[in-house]
């Protein structure tokens, strides 16, 4: 907004033009025009908003009614003036109904002019018995004031009030009828208190108050200023100060008094510094900032993003047990819309690493955010905003993310992907151990449910990466025919049960029925290595099969044995995703017509019957909330 347009209305003789003259002329003048031309007053150089004030004088004559109506419809705020009993009665009988008939929806400042002869008692009586009843009846009246153009009493305050009603509207903050702050105001200020309270002790120290002042008003708060604030709060709200620090009730009480006394500018300064709009919702551009992701790119958390999430974890781990329990998680997400929908759909917290009590560990916390950012970075951006990523001068919310290169299909020239998060599809026949592998990955040794998609960290070469394992059941195989799904997959884990002679044929047939799988790095694994190994009922045994594909022999793993080898296998998966060249299928051109791999489809026609179409809940999440956005 570049200007605030104030239309001054009222009956003839109430002093509309005199009020304008008193504002713009230093000396009292006897000759005042019947109506002033439109006057523009530039903003004060000391003002932070750079908004000029435009004053529109009007006449109440019936022959000027068309012009009056046109100007009222262009107004940002209406200054309605009366000066005696007759003009006061006309406020409710004519003027306010007239404004409503024009369909205008702007704030109104009610002014009694010519009040120089009123003493304090008479002034209070006027406000209580004349103005307050009108405010209660007509909600469009935002403020009222007693003025005198003759004595220049409250003239500057009148037009400041008109300006403030537009730039710093009181209606969204204050319920005039109930004389209390609105629930939305309390909710917004409570969230701001929560964001400023960095040590999570439910108190704002002098240092934290200073941080608030610097962020909102670009000025340091001296110890004297802080002491004055605390003293005022203690007077109006005894429980508002505790051990020299500000409590939430005190913070709310201080802002309530500011708004009640017409000093809502400071409260709006706080709200707008934290990206609140005039409707007290967070700005859409703050929740969903512009963030360009080109085709062939994916999004991960940046070091700044991880640092913020680490700080957040320790801030809310009140019992210092290295995990977030249900109460701590609830406190952390208290001032957001709740757990993100995609988190709920992914069956968090079971989707990540929990301790023996079922609480989210430090690694599990970071892993969950890593996975969700990979699938739906827009949700991550919104929740970084809700949780106050930018509060401590970390920069824009988009600084918490970084854009990385996707896997290039079947490109053996790419020796390494410098990424932190990889997606692995886990495929295999029924009961081959897919779910057991996922449970082992997130250290789920209890009876809790393991979702179809889980995430954990994997450390190799002194670097921590995050691996997302997504199980594809026999009813989910249609996803292997979707190009966007395959583009998202960084590594394909092909499992077979080494103790079941019919297990290997399933994944061998799969490579024929879905030839695009050949473009994805593959790792074969034989599960249940603690049981007797069986000869596979297939023309080519697994070791020879993988050799013909130019891949390493299957890794033998067991999730049940004491000598569990799955940890090393997860490292192998992550390494194969980061260094894909050695895991991409390679069939010599001259042998392409005679390899057993190419003959499999004719030898095992029954394999096609195993492949039905469907989709699990988890894959609905991935397909609809991730792939559709690519």
From Swiss-Prot:
Whether Nucleus counts among this entry's keywords is no
**Its Gene Ontology molecular function terms?**
calcium ion binding; GTP binding; GTPase activity
Q: Which EC number(s) does UniProt give?
A: 3.6.5.-
Q: Show which residues sit on the Mitochondrial intermembrane side of the membrane.
A: 620-630
Every Miro domain range: 1-168, 419-579
Family of the protein in this entry: Belongs to the mitochondrial Rho GTPase family.
Can you say what this protein is called?
Mitochondrial Rho GTPase 1
């Amino acid at each position: 907004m570049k200007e605030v347009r104030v239309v001054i209305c009222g009956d003839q003789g109430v002093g509309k033009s005199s009020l304008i003259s008193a504002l713009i002329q230093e000396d009292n003048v006897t000759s005042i025009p019947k109506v002033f031309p439109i006057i523009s007053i530039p903003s004060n150089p000391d003002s932070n908003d750079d908004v000029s004030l435009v004053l529109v004088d009007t006449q109440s004559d019936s022959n000027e009614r068309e012009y009056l109506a046109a100007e009222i419809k262009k107004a940002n705020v209406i200054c309605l003036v009366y000066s005696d009993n007759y003009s006061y009665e006309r406020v409710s009988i004519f003027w306010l109904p007239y404004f409503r008939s024009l369909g205008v929806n702007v704030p109104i400042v009610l002014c009694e002019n010519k009040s120089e002869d009123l003493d304090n008692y008479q002034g209070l009586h006027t406000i209580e018995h004349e103005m307050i009843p009108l405010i209660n009846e007509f909600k469009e009246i935002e403020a009222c004031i007693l003025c005198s153009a003759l004595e220049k009493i409250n003239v500057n305050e009148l037009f400041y009030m008109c300006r403030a009603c537009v730039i710093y509207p009181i209606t969204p903050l204050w319920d005039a009828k109930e004389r209390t702050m609105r629930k939305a105001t309390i909710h917004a200020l409570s969230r701001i208190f929560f964001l400023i309270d960095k040590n999570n002790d439910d108190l704002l120290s002098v240092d934290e108050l200073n941080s608030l002042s610097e962020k909102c008003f670009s000025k340091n708060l001296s110890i004297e200023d802080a002491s004055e604030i605390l003293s005022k709060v203690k007077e109006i709200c005894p429980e508002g100060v505790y051990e020299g620090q500000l409590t939430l009730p005190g913070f709310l009480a201080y802002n309530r008094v500011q708004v009640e006394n017409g000093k809502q500018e400071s409260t709006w300064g706080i709200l707008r510094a934290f990206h609140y709009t005039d409707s007290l919702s967070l700005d859409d551009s703050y929740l969903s900032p512009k963030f360009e992701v080109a085709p062939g790119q994916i999004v991960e958390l940046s070091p700044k993003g991880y640092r913020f999430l680490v700080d957040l974890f320790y801030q809310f781990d009140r019992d210092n047990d290295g995990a977030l329990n249900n109460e701590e998680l609830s406190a952390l997400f208290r001032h957001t819309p709740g757990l993100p929908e995609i988190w709920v759909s992914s069956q968090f917290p079971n989707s990540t690493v929990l301790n023996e009590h079922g609480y989210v560990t430090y690694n599990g916390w970071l892993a969950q955010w890593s996975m969700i950012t990979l699938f739906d970075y827009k949700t991550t951006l919104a929740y970084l905003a809700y949780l106050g990523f930018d509060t401590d001068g970390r920069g824009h919310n988009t600084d918490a993310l970084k854009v990385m290169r996707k896997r290039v299909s079947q490109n053996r020239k790419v020796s390494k992907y410098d990424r932190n998060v990889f997606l692995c599809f886990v495929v295999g026949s029924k009961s081959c151990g897919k779910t057991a592998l996922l449970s082992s990955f997130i250290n789920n040794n209890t009876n809790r449910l393991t979702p179809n998609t889980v995430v954990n960290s994997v450390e190799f070469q002194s670097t921590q990466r995050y691996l997302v394992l997504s199980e594809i059941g026999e009813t989910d195989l249609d996803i292997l025919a979707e190009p966007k799904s395959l583009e998202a997959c960084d590594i394909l884990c092909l499992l077979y049960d080494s103790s079941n002679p019919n297990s290997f044929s399933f994944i061998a047939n799969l490579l024929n029925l879905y030839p695009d799988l050949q473009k994805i790095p593959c790792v074969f694994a034989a599960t249940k290595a603690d049981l007797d190994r069986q000869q596979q009922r297939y023309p080519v045994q697994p070791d020879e099969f993988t050799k013909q594909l130019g891949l390493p022999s299957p890794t033998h793993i067991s999730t049940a044995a004491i000598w569990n080898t799955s940890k090393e296998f997860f490292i192998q998966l992550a390494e194969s995703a980061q260094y894909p060249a050695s895991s991409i299928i390679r069939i010599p051109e001259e042998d392409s017509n005679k390899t057993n791999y190419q003959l499999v489809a004719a030898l095992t026609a029954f394999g096609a019957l195993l492949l039905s179409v469907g989709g699990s809940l988890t894959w609905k999440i991935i397909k609809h909330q991730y792939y559709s956005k690519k």
